[in-house]
Design a protein with these regions (language model features):
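A charged, aromatic-enriched C-terminal amphipathic alpha-helix characteristic of glycosyltransferases
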Residues: 272-307
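Short hydrophobic beta-strand element within catalytic cores of glycosyltransferases
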Residues: 231-234
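Extended catalytic core of nucleotide-activated donor transferases of GT-like folds
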Residues: 43-114
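Aromatic "clamp/platform" in nucleotide-sugar-dependent glycosyltransferases that forms part
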Residues: 214
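N-terminal pre-catalytic "stem/leader" segment of glycosyltransferase-like enzymes
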Residues: 1-68, 238-240, 249-253, 291-295
Length: 309
């Protein structure tokens, strides 16, 4: 008897990359003929993602031995409750910085009967393999939508997402404004609690994206900016080591806030002059982003699930 795939989630008051990737998993699996659904406590955050997927409400979900429940890292309550149902449990780990939230001392995934862990990046997988005794972590890469056409006309403006690092955002902006009054006309465009489509529109219209990535398992915004030919300046947050190189952006250590303001100014000047260095970085960034096209994620996802249901 074929098993049902149930990705466990809950609604949040603001958008995150993790729930977006879960929706992409469910959509890809359902389109490929799998019995896959998202199980959530509410539909209240669906408007953030513009991505309808087959869904069950938690109140209507009665897990059995015929279900495979895919649970995010750190969700101890779900590990315990769903483990009692007889369902098979798999952990989808999208951020290694949160794994410890699901365990007491000396506990591991095996404590909850979990022997399979899916990770969104090699950075996350390395951590799980090394510290949690899972010998063969499965990596299913994050997927982004590569657009056939991207905005060629860019506003000389800086987009940024302050959610994880509002202090750093404010500090960098203050130093920039005080040191470079001649650039007072450069607009700073915050992307915060907007829908994914609106976030992509704002990213796409700006020449620069200030990456404030912090404690990331992968970090979607910088790679999405690259896909839109928006130049990335800032931090990779750890997980961004999956894609960040000196060829596709201007990357700094997280504490280098003043240097970040200086780099933004330098890049704006090069963009104004239309330098080859900038065009080369944009080309390389777009190429890097193409490696994470959602089709690659779907191929790996199907390979993983074909042998399990």
């Amino acid at each position: 008897m074929a098993k049902s795939i149930r990705y466990i989630l809950k609604a949040f008051q603001e958008p995150f990359g993790g729930p977006l990737q879960i929706r992409r998993h469910v959509k890809a699996l359902a389109e490929s003929g799998f019995d896959a659904r998202m199980v959530t406590d509410s539909l209240s955050d669906n408007h953030f993602y513009d991505l309808p997927v087959p869904t069950l409400l938690r109140s209507d979900f009665n897990p059995t031995q015929s279900d495979i429940c895919v649970i995010p890292e750190g969700w101890r309550k779900e590990f315990e409750e769903l483990g009692k149902s007889g369902a098979t449990l798999i952990c989808l780990c999208q951020n290694h910085f949160y794994v410890h939230l699901g365990f007491k001392r000396k506990e591991t995934f095996a404590t909850f009967g979990i022997d399979t862990v899916i990770c969104c990046s090699r950075q996350v997988a390395n951590h799980v393999e090394r510290y949690y005794g899972v010998p063969d972590v499965q990596v299913i890469p994050c997927g982004i939508e590569m657009r056939p056409e991207v905005p060629r006309h860019k506003e000389l403006a800086i987009s940024f997402m302050p959610r994880k690092a509002p202090y750093q955002a404010g500090f960098i902006k203050d130093v920039f404004n005080r040191c470079y009054p001649e650039l007072d006309g450069v607009e700073w465009i915050a992307i915060d609690a907007q829908s994914h489509s609106e976030a992509m529109r704002r990213l796409g219209r700006t020449a620069l994206f200030l990456s404030l990535a912090h404690r990331e398992g992968f970090g979607l915004p910088p790679i999405e900016a690259m896909s839109l030919r928006t130049l990335v300046v800032g931090f990779h947050g750890g997980g961004g080591l999956e894609y960040a190189t000196s060829r596709n952006g201007y990357w700094l250590y997280e504490g280098e806030l003043i240097q970040c303001a200086q780099e933004l100014r330098s890049c704006l000047e090069m963009i104004r002059r239309g330098t080859r260095e900038i065009s080369d970085k944009l080309d390389q960034g777009q190429l890097t982003a193409s490696y994470f096209d959602v089709s690659r994620m779907k191929t790996r996802l199907i390979e993983f699930w074909e042998g399990r249901v």
